[in-house]
Amino acid sequence: MADWSAEQYLKFEDERTRPARELLAQIPVVAPGKVADLGCGPGNSTELLVERWPDASVIGVDTSADMLRQARERLPQQKFIEANVAHWAPPPGTEVLFANAVFQWVPDHLKHLKRLITGLDEGGVLAVQMPDNVDEPSHVMMREVAFQEPWRHQLSQAAELRDLLPKPGAYYDALRPLCSRLDIWHTVYNHVLDDAAAIVEWVKGTGLRPFIDPLDLHERKAYLAAYTARVAAAYPPQSDGKVLLRFPRIFIVAIK
């Protein structure tokens, strides 16, 4: 898959940042010395961490060069490193690991969550938020269109890229033995967007990328037209012409 686009991602910055704010609000640590933002993206979540803990050493970690470029422009005083969270280990003494919308892309991510919480000192926090929307119409229709001709051959692997998230009980059973306190909850957002085209613009920044990146311009245009038509049927306009994008997310706060 091509690099993530910070510009596309930030078209809905307020909506994308809200879950990070709500995750951060549930972290009870008062004055951590070291904080890491895993999957920091363009720095919108890192900025929240810096505002909450201005005296902490906050680092951002991401695999995307374009996201890191935007993050460094946004927060030039902060440290950002290019690394895969599946292989990265926090510096000794890190007290908060903050992961907003990254681990849904990491295969076998439960294993990595266990590794990260195990590496924390007593009182350290692993805070995670992940979209839980693979079965939402917006994502089901990506796969349905991808399995049609003429895209079936090129996009069959993309259609299988993201698995359903484990059930909350699986996270509980895996993490509870490793921590003193564990909170798990779901929030379902209903984002008010202008129309079906706005939903497509939203997912072009994240979930749709594996489907459109392998296509040339002509193929991409045709795929997006077919996908947009399905989105318009699945998300009818409200009384004022707007549409509601239903968006479930799972939150996990584990305290060592």
Curated annotation (Swiss-Prot):
It is found in: Cytoplasm. The keyword Phosphoprotein does not apply. One of its GO terms (molecular function) is trans-aconitate 2-methyltransferase activity. Its EC number is 2.1.1.144. It catalyses: trans-aconitate + S-adenosyl-L-methionine = (E)-3-(methoxycarbonyl)pent-2-enedioate + S-adenosyl-L-homocysteine. Keywords: Cytoplasm, Methyltransferase, S-adenosyl-L-methionine, Transferase. The keyword Lipid metabolism does not apply. It is an enzyme of class 2 (transferase). CDD domains: AdoMet_MTases. One of its GO terms (biological process) is methylation. GO terms for cellular component: cytoplasm. Catalyzes the S-adenosylmethionine monomethyl esterification of trans-aconitate. Belongs to the methyltransferase superfamily. Tam family. HAMAP family: Tran_acon_Me_trans (MF_00560). NCBIfam families: PRK01683.1. PANTHER family: TRANS-ACONITATE 2-METHYLTRANSFERASE, TRANS-ACONITATE 2-METHYLTRANSFERASE-RELATED. This is Trans-aconitate 2-methyltransferase. The lineage of its organism: Bacteria, Pseudomonadati, Pseudomonadota, Alphaproteobacteria, Hyphomicrobiales.
